[in-house]
Amino acid sequence: MYKKILLFMIALLSFTACSANKEVSETENVSKNEVESKDDNKKNITVTTTFIEDMVHELIGNDKANIELIIPAGEDPHIYVPKPEDFNKLTEADLVLYHGIHFEGKMVDALEGVGYAVTESFDKNDIGEMEDAKDASSMVEDPHFWFDLDLYAEAFTNAANKLKELYADDSQMLALIDENHDRYLKELKDLDKYNGDRIAEIPEGQRYLITPHDAFNYFSRRYDMTVMAPQGVTTDSEVANKDLEDTAQFIADKKIKAIFAESTTNPERMEKLKDIVKSKGFETEVISGHGRELLSDSLADPGEAGDNFIDMYKHNVDLIVDNLK
């Protein structure tokens, strides 16, 4: 374990060496508050993203453990840079859960040393491939698996199994995890039916989803919608003019009446795309603004629409259907 912690310290330092002193002082205050609010009698569980935080909440509730989130709601995991307090969140945890498939970008190497990837059991054939945004001649694995509900259910089961290992000596917690696991899998099946019924409202010739970056290919695969994005699999790459031109031409040719911004990307990119489409003789609408953005790489802030996985998925489907049908 010591070697794993040392490796993480090295990785963390390499990513935060250029951070401002102001940021460090702010995070120190946050860390102090977090320490004061912890219950020493509870297990410490650290998760990287809002998706996995929601899994844990669904399985054991909000008050059965000290649950630490690394990447806050609304931030982009692809480009998130670890902060000093993240070191404590990882090294003090009894269990660390993360996505894997390189979703956590700059934290991947460190996480592999101290945590468990909920995607570890995935069949390679089920993981989608995408064109590498930095090298069009090569392919990369698509990390946005949660839009395939079968894969999400598998990841959820993996998280449940790791929690059962953590609470192996607590029969009440084991029973709770099993009960919540079975309940939630039924809810995912209901969600799948809801999604399919709603998407069927869009005429087949209008089922085109244009988004800033390629987060929805698993969604496309599951619900038979054509998805196009000018940016590629990650959000840390520049958009080539040719990609914008090609996407704009596709929108104009197919007369796609709405294109969508995402909560973790810059909406100005879609406005620029809209202008290029207009120059080609067709006008499309950018669906954006608070509460009108697709949620892709993060759930919404607590208390807002889409702050849990099922509500997030319904929010996206409703937004897509209502603007394309």
What are the functions of these language-model segments?
Residues 2-23:
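Sec-dependent N-terminal signal peptides of Gram-positive bacterial secreted proteins and lipoproteins
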Residues 18-325:
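Extracytoplasmic metal-acquisition and chelation regions
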